[in-house]
A protein has these predicted regions:
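A generic transmembrane alpha-helix motif of multi-pass inner-membrane proteins
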Residues: 372-401, 423-456
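Transmembrane helix-boundary motif of multi-pass solute transporters/channels
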Residues: 11-48, 235-241, 251-255, 259-260
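Membrane-interface "cap" regions at the ends of multi-pass membrane proteins
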Residues: 1-27, 56-61, 65-78, 82-87, ...
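Loop-to-transmembrane helix boundary motifs in multi-pass membrane proteins
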Residues: 5, 11-13, 19, 141, ...
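Membrane-embedded translocation segments of transport machinery
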Residues: 2-6, 168, 172-320, 324, ...
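Inter-helical loop and helix-membrane interface segments of multi-pass membrane transporters/permeases
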Residues: 3-4, 32-36, 66-91, 104-164, ...
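Membrane-water interface regions at transmembrane-helix termini and the short interhelical loops
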Residues: 32-36, 84-100, 135-137, 150-174, ...
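Select transmembrane alpha-helical segments in multipass membrane proteins
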Residues: 5-16, 41-44, 83-97, 145-151, ...
Length: 456
């Protein structure tokens, strides 16, 4: 069977950017920027994106394009005879499932909050009332199961329709809508009373805040955010490399995707900080920002129901674009392994992922166990820890070593594939850094993540 191909370069860029763009761009990056000294943090973040994320992204794409296989079989085609690199293909495949075991639920939260906002559920509520809405959702599994099932069924239906007719066409609509809604929200924020103060806090370098947070924490924070924002290490980018032509270089395409991901992260702060300063709300991050702080702000804002609806459809699309990309990876791996049709594999995985997502849902109520406290307190936190702190950094390290080591695919093969086509080219002078220094940095990120979780 001839391998499917993406119809257009735009489709490839938007799908790959959609995979990279996720909820972390919104609920983590702006908060870390504010705490990390504003523009100084952004500068560090951009430096680390170029140093860390960009090279590894070119490697995932290059392996995918050279192999023309899904992550689970790509190593087998490219690795030296008798080597064991292909074991990571299975680990990456499992990592995709583990990510979806909680990401489908969180995407469902976004859809639920879009529905609540559109129907006026938050109108007239004080801060305690808004908090109660969030707690009610967490303690009523039926609500979360319903929205999680909606996410999985719709996502798998789209993927089952084929690469071009399903994933590519729908992702173009989702991503363009996401970017347009973002810009509308940012423009609205610029006209709020506290916009100037909020933007100053967000973007102007502030040495005192760097000293307060600690220069070491700011540097490691920027490094971690730059590394994890691109969803590298589980083959989510590799799969789309396998669908594209040889017309463009992988570095040039990766730069475009990184720019889109960074644009979304920075504009998220342009939306959030003017609002928090206008209404005198403390800066927060994570679920507290999205599901408690911002609904309170929209309650106080003129036309808040409208702007809140825009915001949660933006968040839903940001999360759903990642879901679609990972679903495609899972289905492609399943097709390669079983030789079954796309529709058969999609139906099987739709049922499987719904079942695998249930522990996350029940982890806030009947399956809330004390032993989960070191990970954050819930099954979602445990699953997130395994993906973010174990599978992603170690997976990125494997792709990196596979491309630079003579015991793997090797530097020459990587450079030849990466530099095919028009666009920016990787240079041979980068070899020392990519071979000897970058692996140490990635290993540091892995070790620091474990230390920060359990020993700090």
């Amino acid at each position: 069977m001839e391998r499917e191909r993406l119809k257009s370069r735009l489709g490839f860029i938007l799908i790959s950017a959609g995979c990279a763009i996720g909820i972390g761009n919104v609920w983590k990056f702006p908060y870390m920027t504010g705490k990390g000294g504003g523009g100084a943090f952004v500068l560090l973040y951009l430096i680390f994106l170029v140093m860390l994320g960009l090279p590894i992204m070119t490697m995932e794409f290059s392996v995918g394009r050279a192999a023309r296989k899904s992550p689970v079989l790509a190593y087998q085609k490219l690795e030296p005879a008798g080597s064991k690199w292909h074991i990571h293909g299975i680990v990456a495949f499992i990592g995709n499932y583990l990510l979806m075991m909680f990401y489908t639920t969180v995407t469902g939260w976004m859809l639920h909050y879009f529905y609540l906002t559109v129907t006026g559920r938050f109108e007239g509520l004080d801060s305690d009332g808004v908090l109660d809405v969030f707690n009610t959702m967490l303690t009523q599994p039926v609500i979360m199961i319903f929205w999680m099932v909606v996410v999985v069924v719709v996502g798998m239906f789209i993927v089952s329709r084929g690469l071009e007719a399903g994933l590519e066409n729908i992702t173009k609509i989702v991503m363009v809508t996401l970017l347009v809604v973002m810009i509308i929200l940012a423009i609205n924020s610029f006209f709020l009373k506290g916009a100037a103060e909020g933007l100053k806090y967000y973007l102007i370098p502030n040495i005192s805040r760097i000293e307060e947070t600690g220069i070491g924490n700011v540097i490691t924070g920027a490094m971690n955010q730059a590394f994890f924002t691109l969803s590298l290490g589980i083959g989510a980018m590799l799969i789309f490399g396998s669908y594209i032509s040889n017309d463009r270089s992988m570095l040039g395409e990766s730069v475009t995707i990184v720019i889109l991901d960074t644009f979304v992260a920075i504009v998220s702060g342009l939306i959030i900080f003017p609002a928090t300063f206008t209404y005198g709300v403390d800066q927060t991050s994570g679920p507290a920002l999205i599901f408690i702080t911002l609904p309170n702000i929209f309650n106080k804002m003129p036309l808040g129901r409208l702007w809140g609806s825009f915001f949660f459809i933006f968040m839903s699309f940001a999360a759903f674009s990642t879901v679609l990309a990972v679903f495609e990876n899972i289905v492609s791996c399943g097709m390669d392994l079983t030789k079954k049709s796309r529709k058969q594999v999609s139906l099987f995985n739709m049922i499987l992922i719904i079942l695998l997502s249930l522990p996350c849902v029940f982890g806030f109520s009947i399956w809330s166990f004390g032993w989960l406290k070191p990970f954050g307190g819930s099954i979602l936190d445990l699953e997130d820890f395994l993906v973010s702190n174990i599978i992603l950094p170690l997976g990125s390290l494997v792709y990196l070593l596979f491309c630079v080591s003579r015991y793997g695919w090797g530097w020459d093969n990587y450079m030849k594939e990466c530099n095919k086509g028009e666009g920016l080219k990787m240079k041979n002078w980068m070899r020392f850094y990519l071979t000897y220094i970058l692996p140490i940095i990635v290993l540091f990120i892995f070790v620091f993540g474990i230390y920060d979780k359990f020993f700090k």
